[in-house]
Amino acid sequence: MTQAVMLQGTASDVGKSVLAAGLCRIFYQDGLRTAPFKSQNMALNSGITPDGKEMGRAQIFQAEAAGIMPDVRMNPVLLKPTSDRQAQIVLMGKVATNMDAVSYHDYKPRLREQILAVYNSLAREYDVIVLEGAGSPAEINLRDRDIVNMGMAEMAQCPVILVADIDRGGVFAAIYGTLALLHKQERDRVKGVIINKFRGDVALLYSGIEQIESLTGVPVLGVMPWLDVDLEDEDGVTLQNGKYKGNDDRDITIAIVQLPHISNFTDFNALAAQPDVRIRYVRRPEELADVDLAILPGSKNTLSDLAWLRESGMADAVLQTHRQGVPVMGICGGYQMLGDTIVDEVESGLGTQPGLGLLNTITRFAQDKTTTQVNATMSGELPGWLAAAAGLPVRGYEIHMGETVLQEGCCTAMTLQKNGCPVADGAVTADGLAFGTYLHGLFDSDAFTRAVVNGLRARKGLAPWETTFCYAEHKARQFDLLAEAMRQHIDIDKIYTIMQQHQEPV
């Protein structure tokens, strides 16, 4: 008999993903085989499973919290916005098509049977499934074809816990309004509420909690404080809210250009966790002043973001930063932008477009998407700030729909191992001031990250920082801290009771 519980929210960014990871960690600590599940995820942060399937990063880090490998069944539908109106539809880890919102809304009912089959397949292998909804279940305009909130809870026949964010204000109105807009059978599925991101003395909430419980008949299971834990975020809302402002007193400042279609900004979590690194996400030219490294990150729409760079003045600012002797790095779409030429006869129909010209490369977009985890070795000789990383092993993953060819003046940055064969990747100039790669997750490799950060320190005349920091251990500690806080502030025994009362045979 598989047990399940689903977290839904009063809005986006209320903390569902993190709390779901916390429950995964708690059940894992308690000896239960646990898996996360989100039927449909809309995010530009994605990752690759060991068998080369693409899925949302949120379910990947939830799987890590549960002590298991990610499995594409944990996120069967991934929507990756390519513009304000279009999204790439990824089904079971592979690109299916592109659709606008209206077309996808009409298409969703055809996915229900497949989603339920995938969920049941996963549930047969685990003791507990922790499901996560998307946005709010009270989107009454989407209710009739819902496959991710109450529609999914109905398919899984599981209880729901509603998560509300008090930090944004109006928490009791959000709880009451959400429950009021649900149908009776949907309200009956909601067995508890968690108030999240509270700052201050919880005693101030007691009278409000009593009233909201009386008004709704739904118990508040706990009040989670605002936690200082370093865990991944699902989408760009956290960037807009300025979460990654960094620490002013750190020696090294790394600027990441916040592209309109930025993807996989989780690439930089390991950098931000370094004790001497300050991460700064930038959107204005003046914000590139006084940085030690500028990075163009991944993009879901390379040519659109390249046009934005030029229109916003950021392209000139990046080039000026480079002329001042500051290294510029590009990852995936950012790597493509650093080149001389981008040829797109597939995606945008814009044909041949000039890049920023910092790397003498030509990129051609392709129909097929490369999705794979890879091991790699940095080139044996690397210049400048990269020198100490020469020959180091690294690990990461590729998600791209293009091929980049190096021209005269560029050297290969690393060699990937694919099916036992060496494959060149990336480019670096002779002075090391321009460096690009398709490899996401590069900074999760501790030795590489410390080598390049120390290379940046050396450029400033600073001594190398010798540290035994391990990012994997750091993440494990964060999961444990989250679980400890949830046990302290949430009635976990009550959640167990809720699940046991609603467990279903699969």
From Swiss-Prot:
<protein>
    <recommendedName>
        <fullName>Cobyric acid synthase</fullName>
    </recommendedName>
</protein>
<dbReference type="InterPro" id="IPR004459">
    <property type="entry name" value="CobQ_synth"/>
</dbReference>
<dbReference type="InterPro" id="IPR002586">
    <property type="entry name" value="CobQ/CobB/MinD/ParA_Nub-bd_dom"/>
</dbReference>
<dbReference type="InterPro" id="IPR029062">
    <property type="entry name" value="Class_I_gatase-like"/>
</dbReference>
<keyword id="KW-0169">Cobalamin biosynthesis</keyword>
<keyword id="KW-0315">Glutamine amidotransferase</keyword>
<comment type="pathway">
    <text>Cofactor biosynthesis; adenosylcobalamin biosynthesis.</text>
</comment>
<dbReference type="Pfam" id="PF01656">
    <property type="entry name" value="CbiA"/>
</dbReference>
<comment type="similarity">
    <text>Belongs to the CobB/CobQ family. CobQ subfamily.</text>
</comment>
<feature type="active site">
    <location>
        <position position="440"/>
    </location>
</feature>
<comment type="function">
    <text>Catalyzes amidations at positions B, D, E, and G on adenosylcobyrinic A,C-diamide. NH(2) groups are provided by glutamine, and one molecule of ATP is hydrogenolyzed for each amidation.</text>
</comment>
<feature type="domain" description="GATase cobBQ-type">
    <location>
        <begin position="251"/>
        <end position="448"/>
    </location>
</feature>
<dbReference type="InterPro" id="IPR033949">
    <property type="entry name" value="CobQ_GATase1"/>
</dbReference>
<dbReference type="GO" id="GO:0015420">
    <property type="term" value="F:ABC-type vitamin B12 transporter activity"/>
</dbReference>
<feature type="active site" description="Nucleophile">
    <location>
        <position position="332"/>
    </location>
</feature>
<dbReference type="InterPro" id="IPR011698">
    <property type="entry name" value="GATase_3"/>
</dbReference>
<dbReference type="InterPro" id="IPR047045">
    <property type="entry name" value="CobQ_N"/>
</dbReference>
<dbReference type="GO" id="GO:0009236">
    <property type="term" value="P:cobalamin biosynthetic process"/>
</dbReference>
<dbReference type="GO" id="GO:0003824">
    <property type="term" value="F:catalytic activity"/>
</dbReference>
<dbReference type="InterPro" id="IPR027417">
    <property type="entry name" value="P-loop_NTPase"/>
</dbReference>
<dbReference type="Pfam" id="PF07685">
    <property type="entry name" value="GATase_3"/>
</dbReference>
